[in-house]
């Protein structure tokens, strides 16, 4: 499956992953090439790593690694020692000030078994939210004082006040509750106007939501699910 599409500004390439088959794809438009980087375990997310040359951060099943796209070497940065074998990482994002936020879910997608973790700059790992379903897309507004977070199992996008000094979050409200007929909200990004662009699994498109009103603004259809 194609997940975690991430543009790498310094490297001028697009990365995405096949989670279950452990493949990282690298598309370089200037060369017109697609390279495959294969791993013996699942990969769930890609995070740009500013100032580290050809290295990117990859979320694996139960750890984060720093991977060099050119040398094809990696080193483990942090492990999740608390994870049950039936749990795995899911969508992960870096906040504007550099913390890594990581969703953890049950491999069978059982509701209520998911969690949201924060990895601080000193690589300390802190559980932030429990009893989640399928933690997914995470974004921040331009000011950096609001975090929006998708729980796919509950088909909602929640809004949190965000303290960039401490990394603390405070629940404000459910910004968007996605109707069943629109499918399941999955990965998410935010544009310059503060609108949320959300890929909907089973909804055949990317949906644009206003977090301030909770209303659907636009929909971009696709032929896939």
Describe the residue ranges of each PLM region:
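Beta-rich, blade/repeat-based domains predominating
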Residues: 1-11, 40-56, 82-99, 128-147, ...
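Hydrophobic alpha-helical segments and helix pairs
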Residues: 72-128
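A short loop-to-beta-strand structural motif that recurs across blades of beta-propeller domains
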Residues: 23-25, 63-65, 114-117, 156-158, ...
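Beta-propeller domains
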Residues: 9-39, 61-66
């Amino acid at each position: 499956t194609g997940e975690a599409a991430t543009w790498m500004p310094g490297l001028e390439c697009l990365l995405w992953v096949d989670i279950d088959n452990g493949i990282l794809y690298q598309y370089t438009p200037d060369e017109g090439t697609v390279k495959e980087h294969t791993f013996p375990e699942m990969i769930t997310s890609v995070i740009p790593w500013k100032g580290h040359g050809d290295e990117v951060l990859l979320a694996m099943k139960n750890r984060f690694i720093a991977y060099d796209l050119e040398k094809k070497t990696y080193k483990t940065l942090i492990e999740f020692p608390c994870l049950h074998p039936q749990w795995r990482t899911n969508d992960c994002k870096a906040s504007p000030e550099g913390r890594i936020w990581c969703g953890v879910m049950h491999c069978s997608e059982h509701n209520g078994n998911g969690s949201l973790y924060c990895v601080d700059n000193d690589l300390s790992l802190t559980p932030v939210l429990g009893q989640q379903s399928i933690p997914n897309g995470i974004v921040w507004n331009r000011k950096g004082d609001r975090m929006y977070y998708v729980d796919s199992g509950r088909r909602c996008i929640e809004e949190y006040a965000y303290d960039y000094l401490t990394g603390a979050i405070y629940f404000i409200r459910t910004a968007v509750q996605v109707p069943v007929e629109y499918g399941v909200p999955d990965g998410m990004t935010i544009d310059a106007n503060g609108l949320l662009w959300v890929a909907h699994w089973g909804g055949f498109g990317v949906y644009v939501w206003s977090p301030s009103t909770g209303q659907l603004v636009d929909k971009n259809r696709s032929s896939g699910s």
